[in-house]
């Protein structure tokens, strides 16, 4: 996210660009892991930010106003794409993660945080906003109901260490080593089975994502089934207008 002068706050143009980048990464078979971070430090004051949420200067009557004058909440589309893409997404929190920016890190698969600069804060109740989906409900699964309500109701600042102790950060890293560590984690994941990573991500999502999660997991299972000789026989028999012969396939107990 490249708006360091406003703590990497997002407006509709930002979220559209984020969506396009994530979509391209999702579709590109040469990509297995995505790192999400914020540009910095700020040219104004040297401050670091991952993302400070929606740019309140772009906020209109029904959402955030784009260059075309339309009101949008398209950051939710970005959240869903991160959640549903078949690849690991790592939030590299190099500074403030606030409001909608906090929700972005929550929806990512893993979070690495700068020891010196990462600060976690939910400001929804300060600006009359509320992330009623992954940003709050999924957060409660991570840190527990009471702690999640504290985070949202009080809007306090939490250090990287405090966030790690709550369970919403995987590791706290010295700032100078944060980017290199993120690449190391990505390389470790890239050394694993792509099919396993995909299926494990969707399996872990399944219990929280209802019928949508079930559909995604089932779709991936169907993809695996298509690769079997049994499936090829079914397809070929249909195309050749004959009865399929599954004689060599066994009913596995």
Would you name each region that the model predicts?
Residues 4, 45, 113-118, 130, ...:
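C-terminal long alpha-helix characteristic of the crotonase
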Residues 1-41:
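Conserved CoA-thioester-binding segment of acyl-CoA-metabolizing enzymes
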Residues 6, 38-81, 97, 126-128:
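Glycine- (often His-adjacent) and acidic-residue-rich active-site loop
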Residues 78-84, 92, 98-152, 166, ...:
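CoA-thioester-processing core
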Residues 110, 150, 154-156, 162, ...:
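Well-ordered beta-strand positions
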Residues 53, 72, 76, 99, ...:
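Glycine-rich phosphate-binding loop at the start of an alpha helix
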């Amino acid at each position: 996210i490249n708006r360091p002068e406003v703590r990497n706050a997002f407006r509709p143009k930002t979220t559209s660009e984020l969506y396009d980048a994530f979509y391209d990464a999702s579709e590109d078979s040469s990509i297995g892991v995505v790192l999400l971070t914020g540009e910095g430090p700020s040219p104004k004051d040297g401050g670091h930010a991952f993302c400070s949420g929606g740019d309140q200067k772009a906020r209109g009557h029904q959402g955030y106003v784009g260059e075309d004058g339309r009101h949008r909440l398209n950051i939710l589309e970005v959240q869903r794409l991160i959640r549903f893409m078949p690849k690991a997404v790592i939030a590299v929190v190099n500074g403030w993660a606030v409001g909608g920016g906090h929700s972005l890190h929550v929806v990512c698969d893993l979070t690495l945080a700068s020891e010196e600069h990462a600060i976690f804060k939910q400001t929804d109740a300060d600006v009359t906003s509320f992330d009623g989906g992954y940003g709050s409900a999924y957060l409660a699964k991570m840190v527990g109901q009471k702690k999640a309500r504290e985070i949202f109701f009080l809007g306090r600042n939490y250090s990287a260490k405090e966030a790690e102790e709550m369970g919403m950060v995987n590791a706290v890293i010295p700032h100078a080593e944060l980017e290199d560590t993120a690449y190391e984690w990505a390389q470790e994941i890239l050394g694993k089975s792509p099919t396993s990573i995909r299926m494990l991500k969707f399996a872990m999502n399944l219990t929280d994502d209802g019928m949508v999660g079930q559909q995604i997991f089932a779709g991936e299972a169907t993809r695996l089934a298509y690769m079997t000789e049994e499936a090829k026989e079914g397809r070929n028999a249909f195309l050749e207008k004959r009865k399929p012969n599954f004689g060599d396939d066994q009913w596995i107990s």
